[in-house]
Every structure is written in structure tokens, then in C-alpha cells.
Amino acid sequence: MYRENHHIHFVGIGGIGMSGIAELLLHLGYSVSGSDLRSSATTKRLQDLGATIYEGHQAASCAGASVVVTSSAVAEDNPEVVQAREDKIPVIPRAEMLAELMRLKTFGIAVAGSHGKTSTTSLIGCLLSQTGFDPTIVVGGKVDSFGGNAKLGEGDFLVAEADESDGSFLKLSPVLEVVTNIDLEHLDYYTDIEHIKETFLSFIDKIPFYGAAIVCLDDENVAAILPQVQKRLITYGLTPQADVSADNLRFAAGRSTFRVRAAGEVLGEISVFPSGTHNVYNALAAVAIGLELEIPFGKIATALASFGGVQRRMQHKGEGKGITVIDDYAHHPTEIRASLKAIKETWPEKRLVVLFQPHRYSRTQALFEEFKTCFHQADCLIMTDIYEASESPIEGVSTEILLEAIKAHGQRYTRHIPEIASLATEVMPNLREGDLVVTLGAGNIVQAGEEICQLLGQE
């Protein structure tokens, strides 16, 4: 964008992906406004940086905008979108604005995949920040090391999380791509797993001749598309067949430690936060990026060792009375299995009490079979009503039905507490010393964990 007097309006500006782009544009000197259904700490932060924020969606909010940016959650009948189209104001998806930011930098690194995108993007951002690249970073989570979900750097690289949920990540033109995995997800947009794989193939095909795709060889759906890829590939995984591989995995004190091999030789060890095999994969992708950029392995190891984590990813919320509270964003069965496995590996002696909030009726319906068995690591499973995320209820899809199926598949202790507001107070009497409470989900389940921490401090 060649004029800095552009007025950029975001519909749904409080979203984790939208707010990061808005923050970068503010730092670049653009006029930014935005609306969201309700105020939040995120919208307050943007307001403090100079954005004009509207609570709720009204047609007048986009008046005077040069362009209107929408997230995939914004419907076409949103009054601001309708008004913008009537006024001939361009309406673009979030990914198109991210692509414009990427164009302003010399080299883009995009991280895509069904799971692990946020952590992997954050690790790569940390690596480049700690090794002198001073990258610009846009990520779908709040990263402790730079205190938010976006950072404007002076260097030539932009590191971004690429959202595949509506296919709009195809608007990006990165030089390096990471594909962490491909799983059945976002079936409100995709028809089936083959449709998802075809879209990822198109994404990889956007790499220029001098770029590369860094892909996880251990993921069966990623491996399935590799014969069709015509771009340069760098594979990573636990298999020794990968270009960059890990072995000798250990988990202790909340950290993952492993040995790295590349080009047939042992490079050394990496120790990174947090614990878990899935986090080893995330870190391996960052190692592969570092090696591709010719960063010495010792510097890669030092940089990744300094990584402090991402909020809502295996995040320690607090403890009291011998009870520990952890929060995690996992909401897909694959993510839930990985997170609970990692937690059990780290705290094998603790009773694991899981508070889960299902996210979206469509996801609960599409992945119903997978949800039946993904909680087996939990000693106690307590589930709230489904977080609708702007969806309408679907007949035959409910927490009660899901819990009955989970119980029928061997889960011993299950309980339904419909409302988040009463979850903490109803759970507290059943907790005992030595318990580990984990809040899981992509909605507002984190509030329950924070309330439990407060109650533990008051007793």
C-alpha cells in the first residue's frame, strides 16, 4: 500500500488473527478502526495504540474506510459488510491484508497445518529474533517473549501463521513454508480430507523456485501428497528417513529435550518449552528453518532454549492447596490426545481432571467418532455446553449426547456442567490435593481455570 493515509477497517478486530494485523498496521502509520461484538483486553490494547474501536456491528462504523477487512467468522449479511459493498468499499479477507504485509518484506515464512501452527510460528519467530534477523511476526496467540500476537521488526523476514480454515491462505506468497500436518477439520468449508489435501498442494505450489516447503514426514496425509509436489522439499520428523530428525526424546520439568540429526550426522541436542512429543515436532520445524537460513546449530539451540511459550498452550495458570491448574487451546480430538498425553508424561503421578468446552456444533458433529475416545488419559472429564462460535444449534448434536457416547466407550467418570459461570464453584468441592486441573477448548473455558485459581487462593 503506497499511501499511509489509508483508513483500514476490521470487522471482528478483537479476534486473535485480526488484532495482530491491525497492530502492525498501526505501527506502520495507517489509520485503523474496527468493530467487535464486545470490548476485551485486546480491543483496549488496540485503542491505546490509536485504533478507533466500535462495540457491536453497525453500518456507520465503516464510513470513510479505504478497505474493510473481514475474518472467516464474519457473515456476508453483517451490516458493515453490506454497507461497505453498497459504498463500493473493497471488502477483503484477513489473509489478503496479511499478504499485503508480507509483500512489504523481502521474504515471507508462512506456517500452515491443522495443528501446531501457533506454537511453530512462535518458535520460528523466537529463533529469528534471537539470531539477529529482527523479523516481523504475526501469530494466532499471545507470545510471552514479545508480549502479544504481533511484532514489527526492521529485518527482511515476515513470519506468519497461515490460516487454512477457509482456503484464503492461498493468497499468501511466502518464500518458505511449513506444513505441520493435515487433518480432517473446518468441514464448514472443505468437503472432505481430499479437498483439504488438494488445497495444501496448491499452497505448496505457490513457493518460488528458490524457496522450499518444510513438511512433517511423519504425518500420513502430508506424506500422501509429497509425490505430487514439484517444489523443493525439506522433511522433518522422528523417522530417520526425514532430512531433519529427532531421537532420544525426554520430558522433564515441563520441557522437551531431544537429539537432532541432519544430513546423516548428529548436530546436538535441543531443549525447549513445553513438554510433549507434539512440541518436539514444532521445534523440529523451527530447527529446519534455522538450518535452511544457515544459522549455526549452536545458535539455534540457544535461541529455542529461551522460548517462553504461548498463552493457552500448556499454560500454567496457578496452583494452591496442592492443586495445579493448566490451560490449553486443544479443541480437536487430535490436539486433545496430544495435549493430554504430554501432560501425563510430565505429571504421571497426578489425578487429571479435565474441564472441556466443545467448540462449534459443526465440529462436534463432524468429529463425533473421534471425540468418543480422545479423553482416555483423563481421570475425570467434566464438559460444558457447546461453545457455538456464531453457529446455530444442529439437531442431534449436544454435550449430553457426546458424553453418553464417551461414557459408553470406557470413560469412567464424566459430568455435565452446562454453564461456564458455575463451573469453578461446582468443581471445587470435588478437587483434592495432588490434582491437576486442565481447561481445554477454543472458547472461553479459560475463565473457569482462572476462577479456580482465585478460589484456591481464597481458601
Curated annotation (Swiss-Prot):
This is UDP-N-acetylmuramate--L-alanine ligase. It comes from Desulfotalea psychrophila (strain LSv54 / DSM 12343). It is found in: Cytoplasm. Keywords: ATP-binding, Cell cycle, Cell division, Cell shape, Cell wall biogenesis/degradation, Cytoplasm, Ligase, Nucleotide-binding, Peptidoglycan synthesis. The lineage of its organism: Bacteria, Pseudomonadati, Thermodesulfobacteriota, Desulfobulbia, Desulfobulbales. It catalyses: UDP-N-acetyl-alpha-D-muramate + L-alanine + ATP = UDP-N-acetyl-alpha-D-muramoyl-L-alanine + ADP + phosphate + H(+). Pathway: Cell wall biogenesis; peptidoglycan biosynthesis. Signal peptide: none annotated. Its EC number is 6.3.2.8. It comes from the Bacteria. One of its GO terms (molecular function) is UDP-N-acetylmuramate-L-alanine ligase activity. The gene is murC. It is an enzyme of class 6 (ligase). ATP binds at G113, S114, H115, G116, K117, T118, S119. Cell wall formation. InterPro entries: Mur-like_cat_sf (IPR036565), Mur_ligase_C (IPR004101), Mur_ligase_C_dom_sf (IPR036615), Mur_ligase_cen (IPR013221), Mur_ligase_N (IPR000713), MurCDEF_pg_biosynth (IPR050061), UDP-N-AcMur_Ala_ligase_MurC (IPR005758). SUPFAM superfamilies: MurCD N-terminal domain (SSF51984), MurD-like peptide ligases, catalytic domain (SSF53623), MurD-like peptide ligases, peptide-binding domain (SSF53244). Belongs to the MurCDEF family. GO terms for cellular component: cytoplasm. GO terms for biological process: cell division; cell wall organization; peptidoglycan biosynthetic process; regulation of cell shape. PANTHER family: UDP-N-ACETYLMURAMATE--L-ALANINE LIGASE, UDP-N-ACETYLMURAMATE--L-ALANINE LIGASE-RELATED. The keyword GTP-binding does not apply.
